[in-house]
Amino acid sequence: MSDNGSPAVLPKTEFNKYKIGKVKSTPAIQRDAKTNLTYIKLRKRSSEKVYGCTVFQNHYREDEKLGQGTFGEVYKGIHLETQRQVAMKKIIVSVEKDLFPITAQREITILKRLNHKNIIKLIEMVYDHSPDITNAASSNLHKSFYMILPYMVADLSGVLHNPRINLEMCDIKNMMLQILEGLNYIHCAKFMHRDIKTANILIDHNGVLKLADFGLARLYYGCPPNLKYPGGAGSGAKYTSVVVTRWYRAPELVLGDKQYTTAVDIWGVGCVFAEFFEKKPILQGKTDIDQGHVIFKLLGTPTEEDWAVARYLPGAELTTTNYKPTLRERFGKYLSETGLDFLGQLLALDPYKRLTAMSAKHHPWFKEDPLPSEKITLPTEESHEADIKRYKEEMHQSLSQRVPTAPRGHIVEKGESPVVKNLGAIPRGPKKDDASFLPPSKNVLAKPPPSKIRELHQNPRPYHVNSGYAKTAIPPPAAPAGVNRYGPNNSSRNNRFSGNSTAPNNSRNPVNRFHPETNVSSKYNKVPLPLGPQSRYQGNSNESRYKNSPNDSRYHNPRYVNKPETNFNRQPQKYSRQESNAPINKNYNPSNGSRNMAGDHHQGSRPSHPQFPISPSQGQHQLTSKPIEKKNGSFKDERAKPDESKEFQNSDIADLY
């Protein structure tokens, strides 16, 4: 610097004569007054750049978030200059260590060296929030780095879970060939992917599959793979065994083997291939130990011939199980014999018996019908792993709003709503006291011993399915003979009914209670009740409700007997005696003033109660056409009476109930 303070002019030298370019500005040299030292003052640039990276501002814009992983987050972005959609993978920088992640370094390095149509392409690196250059200790603090990748419309996980996408076998073969092509290129470049799964297989708008997410990939030692042996076989190099997502982890990794090869990627391809058919991961272990059990349940416990090295691995105790292989039973409905052989060789327990990517491309399964398609056509809808939750919610909502299907046996015509038609009144179900719900000790309808049947001459508290038990088991006492509780001159009550019988028409006369035209009982009548279709206490008390004629109705009004136009909509008795095969009693004459209560009277069984037949020794207590004669000023019933020696005892009732 000159004395007047103007910048010093550099003298012309031989070097300046050959200098290329033009010096934009001469640095200003300043002197410190305290130390008397000269120094050059540096000016801060408008934008601090990182070598090989592009600044984020004014170049890219973030849109929606596509997903999040262990080592970063993925966003959908737009390149502002070209307005093209890109995928931006944000790299998480640890604040404590202030170091660039080793996984990101490996991924960037490997992607820069790979160039294949089935491998994702790294466009460039982007950063934002430039730090203060005076703070050298925090060069990466508050700085975000992005990996700019081409935007893919779908990944294989979202495609398989999308209910609106159905892949044919020809499309599956096309996808498998593309996966094997990309994986073979990686292995031949002496890299292991170590994280093959459906979420890391991307699909572009042209149906081209691309392997992505090389965060766990690394260089392996040894020879590259060939048609027989995997890459790195026999090298003796050790790697970490905590790699690959658990559900896609090879059995040698589960057992703790550290000297693994590129065969761990082939196992993941086999899991992806089986997932095409079940639409979900096929080996979903809950823990690392449980993952081994799940694998051996599908492929069987390895024997000495299947996998000789397994018993020398750290997790060899899992090989002591005794599981049978179920691969054929599980996937036999989806694949042919050739397809099962292809899947079995991809999922071989011994890594040295597993197919390589180079040999798998030439398997006979790809040459049988149907042949692989030339191009995969996917719908315009985007399908990513982040959309799986939405697919499940839509599926649950559609199932809850689905119209109920038609019942079995009902044919839905065209244009008809698949609902059950109105079938009218449905019969009532059995009551809780039904015989089918009672134990044998309390079941009245259960057949008692034969001795009990012969001793009974009356119905023991009749029971019906719809109405239950009768109100009483023993008839009430009747009035003495000849006693008229309404008086002998009560003609208004005596002329209420008319019939063909010669007996008086006194409906309240206790003597006439058994007349065919009178069915009114009296508590003063001690005359034993006969058995027959006219007995009030025989069978079910509700059997008279639904008869074939209006006179058989319980609510019968005699005023409308002679009016044929009256419509009595009564349903016929369900268990009619007319449907029975029992012989009809020819002595019974319904035209003699007796009403047909529940069909014709059957011989050999009690009226309206077929469960308790009457033995011939007890007699057939039936109504006959013999009229009642009046003797000594009173009516006397000359009809057959039950044997007094066969009275119904209380002990019998107790035994029965």
UniProtKB/Swiss-Prot annotation:
What does it catalyze?
L-seryl-[protein] + ATP = O-phospho-L-seryl-[protein] + ADP + H(+); L-threonyl-[protein] + ATP = O-phospho-L-threonyl-[protein] + ADP + H(+); [DNA-directed RNA polymerase] + ATP = phospho-[DNA-directed RNA polymerase] + ADP + H(+)
- SMART domains with a match to the protein in the record: S_TKc
Q: One Pfam family this chain carries?
A: Pkinase
The residue ranges flagged as biased composition, category Low complexity, are 489-501
**PANTHER family of this UniProt entry?**
CELL DIVISION PROTEIN KINASE (PTHR24056), CYCLIN-DEPENDENT KINASE 9 (PTHR24056:SF233)
Q: Which family does it belong to?
A: Belongs to the protein kinase superfamily. CMGC Ser/Thr protein kinase family. CDC2/CDKX subfamily.
Q: What else is known?
A: Present with 2070 molecules/cell in log phase SD medium.
From the Swiss-Prot or TrEMBL record, give the protein name. Serine/threonine-protein kinase BUR1
Species of origin reads: Saccharomyces cerevisiae (strain ATCC 204508 / S288c)
The record's gene field reads: SGV1
